[in-house]
């Protein structure tokens, strides 16, 4: 079954449960917008499925690792997208290797995102993630 979620402006977050199958959390906004943080605290309390990204697209680089860990430990999302580097296989693999060793709260699934500039890089990035033990692997839109 296909599930849909839209990144939702703060003013519509309260209504988003009516049109989103799950919640997609951008961690940098948890530090910037009190209303955003409160929405995700309530979503967690209601048992909503939460995927926490690393804010690469929004910031141009993944959010600070210490702040990511803080929010992972506080919200305990269902999934966490480990820090990746836009279209850079090698740097993304380095990050994935590091995060593969980090213990997250029970119930949080780590998701690694394939980043590459060629189909060969994409294939080797994917295989490396598999070899590192990632069970959920996503593909970048780039």
Label each PLM-derived region with a short phrase:
Residues 1-102:
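Non-catalytic, usually N-terminal nucleic-acid engagement modules in DNA/RNA processing proteins
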Residues 72-142:
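Eukaryote-skewed repeat-based solenoidal scaffolds used as protein-protein interaction platforms
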């Amino acid at each position: 079954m296909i599930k849909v979620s839209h990144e939702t402006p703060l003013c519509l977050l309260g209504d988003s449960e009516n049109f989103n199958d799950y919640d997609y959390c951008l961690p940098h906004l948890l530090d910037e917008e009190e209303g955003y943080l409160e929405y995700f605290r309530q979503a967690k309390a209601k048992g909503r499925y939460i995927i926490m990204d690393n804010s690469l697209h929004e910031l141009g680089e993944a959010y600070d690792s210490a702040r990511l860990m803080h929010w992972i430990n506080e919200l305990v999302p269902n999934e966490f997208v480990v820090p990746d580097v836009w279209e850079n296989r090698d740097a993304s693999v380095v990050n994935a290797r590091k995060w593969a060793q980090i213990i997250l709260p029970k119930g949080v699934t780590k998701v690694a995102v394939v980043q590459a500039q060629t189909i060969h890089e994409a294939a080797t990035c994917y295989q490396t993630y598999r070899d590192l033990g990632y069970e959920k692997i996503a593909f970048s839109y780039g």
